[in-house]
Amino acid sequence: MRRRAFISLLGGAVAWPVVTRAQPSERMRRIGVLMFLAEDDPGAKTRIAAFIEGLQQLGWTIGRNVQIDIRWGAADAVRSRKYAAELAATAPDVIFATASETTAALRETTRTLPIVFVGVTDPVGAGYVASLARPGGNATGFAFVEYGTGAKWLELLKEIAPRVTRAVILRDPTLPAGTGQLGAIQALAPSIGVETAPIDVRDVGEIERAIANFARTPNSGLVVSTSPAAVANRKPIITLAAQHSLPAVYFLNTFAEDGGLISYGPDVLSQYRQAAGYIDRILKGEGPADLPVQAPTKYELVINLKTAKALGLEVPPTLLALSPTR
């Protein structure tokens, strides 16, 4: 593999399918998609392309046997609720939700239309499903990360920046994941000589003030736990970490791609393709109540070598060896 600024080279955008006329013998099916990110977000475009690629591999072609109506929430809760209502009003065969926030908006709108979600850390705690094995309602999908992954983030921070003795944890306390991941981090912290301080993620101004205040303490680091707010504000968070020379670990590979030091989390594109598989099964007659919620099967470690160099960090060979090569 050619190692450039990133240890992990992720696949590029997939070519969009050719639109053809529906054949008389085929029934046109309709899929609604509620994206959490904005339409001009490069990561969002790559993800929706992976989703459509997954559908194509299962025999679904836009304009021939399926129509896809995509709405872009742009990380805005009000906008997501509006588009959730609009999508539900069109009564598609199934709706694809791409984050906890969009899933919540859809669940508030409909309890009958089938929903397949990705990007939800604790669907049981959030009330979207009765259990992982038997969802029991109109929603199922693919969980994002387990709470224990929080401890892995802290381990990675300490490994890539051994001098860190104090870590601030960006989290959303309104989400079950915000509490669960923090608990896993705090349980590990004493054994590796790190003190922790949680910061609630709500808006950029609050994050900026908290990080600036925290950065005054020597040997500090940053752990960004899963939340839609962190994704929406990823570029300001990355910029703040760089301005204050804070080594930081993130839960999503797009953070490292955008300049963050290191990320560890599920292969998101793989989950989007898997979601296409569940939607295919629903379109063929299965119900979300009987399709178990699946945990991630593949995780990715991404290291931004340029950022590591700027922070004066030497990436350990053990981490380089764990980085995927494509």
Enumerate the language-model features and the residues they cover:
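Short hydrophobic alpha-helices and adjacent helix-cap/hinge residues
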Residues: 1-326
